């Protein structure tokens, strides 16, 4: 079983006197910087240019610095930038200023695991991967809670990399919930797999095919949207709160019987075999290699895919129904 760390297992002392630079001020960057500061950690925000993120950081009470200046004046460098720009920022803005004893910290293992970034041997390299988007990381922390996270060490020059990883996790609120120790390899491969086969790829494609099947059979698109796409949230919320057994207990016997019999017909063993192929591509590095190449050519697959989704019947129907769906939502 995995080792789970909570507040009582972790001390902030190991990073209390360290200077931390958060590179990036997007969803995760803002949440981490605010939470770290509220935990008493000395934080600076490093940004590439004076844009919207710069203004947001100033509005939040920070004095943003250019990336290289933030790096030069810090002991712990936290990469909270998009995966595909981290390597360039590292080579141009971070690597020239690295000194022995500094730390490189990541929220996802992609660049380290696939060796897009190869740190020198005299620095610590570790990861804290919150299991929620940045706004939730901040919201839960501000309300006295926290979201779970994974931690891992890749390079332990100081002998204290795990202690520091756990301390950073505590400072952003993760140990209030629970922190699981993993490896860069495990986090990267399982994260990519989940995104591809169900969370982003599989579930969206399943919902789209279900919607299209009903519409092609002559059912009203609006009704099809409610039954195959909109109600997914209700089911996922039940699974999130109560697990599969709790969800099944909550739905009707008719839904249980239909789901248990037809579900296995639609999602059969052949799907699992294709999932294994997707995992093989992740583990071998083929997916990463293909994605890096695609990004370098302008990421046209994403642009074309987004255009196709935006112009699809299901998306157009969803946009038209959003006012109805949200109108009845109680005011918080």
From Swiss-Prot:
Substrate binds at residue 252. Keywords: Amino-acid biosynthesis, Branched-chain amino acid biosynthesis, Magnesium, Metal-binding, NADP, Oxidoreductase. Its EC number is 1.1.1.86. Gene3D superfamilies: 6.10.240.10, NAD(P)-binding Rossmann-like Domain. Pathway: Amino-acid biosynthesis; L-isoleucine biosynthesis; L-isoleucine from 2-oxobutanoate: step 2/4; Amino-acid biosynthesis; L-valine biosynthesis; L-valine from pyruvate: step 2/4. Residues 2-182 form the KARI N-terminal Rossmann domain. It catalyses: (2R)-2,3-dihydroxy-3-methylbutanoate + NADP(+) = (2S)-2-acetolactate + NADPH + H(+); (2R,3R)-2,3-dihydroxy-3-methylpentanoate + NADP(+) = (S)-2-ethyl-2-hydroxy-3-oxobutanoate + NADPH + H(+). GO terms for molecular function: ketol-acid reductoisomerase activity; magnesium ion binding; NADP binding. NADP(+) binds at residues 25-28, 53, 83-86, 134. Belongs to the ketol-acid reductoisomerase family. This is Ketol-acid reductoisomerase (NADP(+)). It comes from Sulfolobus acidocaldarius (strain ATCC 33909 / DSM 639 / JCM 8929 / NBRC 15157 / NCIMB 11770). The lineage of its organism: Archaea, Thermoproteota, Thermoprotei, Sulfolobales, Sulfolobaceae. The gene is ilvC.
